[in-house]
Amino acid sequence: GDWKKTVKPGEHFETPTAILSVCEGGIDDICHRLVCAGSKYVDNGPESEQELPIIFNEYCTTWGNPSHENICKILENIKGRGFDYFVIDCGWFKEDGIPWDISMGDYNVSSTLFPQGLEKTVEAIREKGMKPGIWFEIETVGSAARAYQDTSHLLHKDGAVLTSYFRRFWDMRDPYVEDYLTKK
């Protein structure tokens, strides 16, 4: 994406709190420091966040190639392990031969990966005692998506479509975009 904030002389801009750290040692040492520094924010969070669900996101098992078949195998391996949600990550929408990272935007379920639609996979997730979830990078449109070419609903900056590498961005102020994404 693209974001900037111009602060003129005499003006000020306040950012949200961020936690940064450095240390001598390894990754475990720095992680420990960050967890300790952030725990006061987590521990003092609202009541609704005290009991957060445990989520299994399948991305690091399918690497953007989820299918009904491989999700059923994963479900068999993780059943009874305390997960509340099973999230189907990227790739569920990609067309044959096109990488997921340039396919987002049209968001049509792949009939190759899910020949019976997502419904059958959702049913399998529920049968294993978990709630189904699905990943959307809702704001982006990849260069292989049909929506990439229809620039009338994409975000513009200085009169040009805002493009970052191989991605463009939906204009979330556009009622068409809200309707389109709601239906997806």
Indicate where each model-derived feature is located.
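Aromatic-lined carbohydrate-binding/catalytic grooves of carbohydrate-active enzymes
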Residues: 49-183
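Beta-strand-rich recognition/accessory modules
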Residues: 1-46
